[in-house]
Amino acid sequence: MSIFTKIKKSLKSENLVNYNKFIKNLEFDEKNSTSTHLIIKAPNIFIANFVKRKYLNKISELYEKETGIKPKIDIVTKEISHRPLTIEEIIEPTTPSVLIPEYTFESFIVGPSNQFAYTAAKSVAENPGKNYNPLFIYGGVGLGKTHLLQAIGNYLKSSLNVLYVTSEQFMNEFTENIRMKTPERFHEKYRNCDVLLIDDVQFFAGKERTQEEFFHTFNELYNQKKQICLTADRPPKKLYDLVDRLRSRFEAGLIVDIQPPELETKIEIIRKKCELNGIYLPEEIIEYIATKLDSNIREIEGMITKINAMSKILGISEITLDFAKQALKEHIKDKKEVITLEDIIKLIAKEFNIKPSEIVSKSRNKNIVAARRCAIYLAREFTKESTPIIAKYFGLRDHSAVSHAIKSFNKKLKEDSEFRIKIEELKNKIQIKKSE
Ligand SMILES: Nc1ncnc2c1ncn2[C@@H]1O[C@H](COP(=O)(O)OP(=O)(O)OP(=O)(O)O)[C@@H](O)[C@H]1O
């Protein structure tokens, strides 16, 4: 009998009223668990939350009694394996401890905000140890750093010895091996891989012994032309508590950033997540989530899961916009509507040296058309107006004309780096106005 079956049996024998409802259908994820880190699958988010609140300590205790090991336990839902569970947890930064098969290049949506990082990661995966070494990916919370790092690992794991760890795991293992007087075991593991992927290296900050060890690991692998990829929440030059020689190693490779996704990219990501998880959401709800929530994709995923789970539990077959609004009510921060369509028009008119009225006119003058497209794009990014309202305001036929204008705009953003910089500057100006 497996240990997990024994644990379930003990929970049953303790006559827990909720055994059938909450414990019976829990499954042990053998493939992804280790002896110190257990992953348990629950049928849905509510059961998972309940088990976490009520039974986690008990399960941990029973496991320790059986094995002598105090485990770390993650309870995940079957729908989205490996996801942390409560909405609060989903919003919290969390990093997995194993390679997650779903994090691939194919499931990663590319837009102007992450194009550079994606291309660099793909290139590293296709030519490990040859093009960019190390690859350093940085960016804000929940923007896809781990996903890209793991995509490299998943791409290479069948042909090479890939090692994926968080900086914390690296540190814990190092400390543990020192404590057990087995440093050679640690060296054996880390200095003999072909690809080393370390997530969240900002946590090396201030840990001098770990940094020292990592420095040697780095050199050893680098000299053997093994690929090293790192992620952090900031660029190497801002990792202040890192020893200089390590920082300069990081800086010697390719450094790429991931920016918050543009609205279109966000919408695409939501579509993809729904598709991957077999969730159907009408377009208007997808757009609602994308415009109302910030850029943290993990948070967005949490909201999709929540809407889906609530609809199932309440037996609702068709999810309406009102239902979604209700479900997300408490999670949508009450941001004041500070940027209006008029603000955008004024700003663009000034930038393009034309009159505000010309932007909303029917003129086909090249400069005015460019200004209009830009204004439409920014209106979608920064105001809370729906696509039909924006169409009406700019004198366009209907919402599909808005989508068309945004598509052409995104194409230009992708192709023309000077243009991209100009738009970034405009976005910054709007952000400044927003925070005034
Ligand atoms: N462009 C994208 N396409 C598809 N999914 C994405 C994209 N960007 C982020 N995600 C998803 O968002 C979630 C959070 O991403 P990830 O864990 O990679 O973020 P992170 O940048 O590593 O965040 P943290 O700083 O908290 O570690 C993941 O489920 C990931 O699949």
Swiss-Prot record:
Gene: dnaA
Keyword Nucleotide-binding: yes
Gene3D superfamilies on file: 1.10.1750.10, 1.10.8.60, 3.30.300.180, P-loop containing nucleotide triphosphate hydrolases (3.40.50.300)
Family of the protein in this entry: Belongs to the DnaA family.
Domain III, AAA+ region, as annotated region: 98-311
Organism, scientific name: Nautilia profundicola (strain ATCC BAA-1463 / DSM 18972 / AmH)
InterPro entries: AAA+_ATPase (IPR003593), Chromosome_initiator_DnaA (IPR001957), Chromosome_initiator_DnaA-like (IPR020591), DnaA_C (IPR013159), DnaA_dom (IPR013317), DnaA_N_dom (IPR024633), DnaA_N_sf (IPR038454), P-loop_NTPase (IPR027417)
Subcellular location(s) of the protein: Cytoplasm
A GO molecular function held by the record: ATP hydrolysis activity
The name this protein goes by in its record: Chromosomal replication initiator protein DnaA
Signal sequence, renumbered to the chain: none
UniProt GO cellular component terms: cytoplasm; plasma membrane
Keyword Cell division: no
Pfam families, A to Z: Bac_DnaA, Bac_DnaA_C, DnaA_N
Sequence segments annotated as region (Domain IV, binds dsDNA): 312-436
One of the GO biological process terms: regulation of DNA replication
Assembly description: Oligomerizes as a right-handed, spiral filament on DNA at oriC.
UniProt keyword list: ATP-binding, Cytoplasm, DNA replication, DNA-binding, Lipid-binding, Nucleotide-binding
Stated role: Plays an essential role in the initiation and regulation of chromosomal replication. ATP-DnaA binds to the origin of replication (oriC) to initiate formation of the DNA replication initiation complex once per cell cycle. Binds the DnaA box (a 9 base pair repeat at the origin) and separates the double-stranded (ds)DNA. Forms a right-handed helical filament on oriC DNA; dsDNA binds to the exterior of the filament while single-stranded (ss)DNA is stabiized in the filament's interior.
Region spans: Domain II: 69-97
Lineage start: Bacteria, Pseudomonadati, Campylobacterota, Epsilonproteobacteria, Nautiliales
Source organism superkingdom: Bacteria
UniProt note: domains: Domain I is involved in oligomerization and binding regulators, domain II is flexibile and of varying length in different bacteria, domain III forms the AAA+ region, while domain IV binds dsDNA.
Binding-site positions, ATP: 142, 144-146
Sequence segments annotated as region (Domain I, interacts with DnaA modulators): 1-69
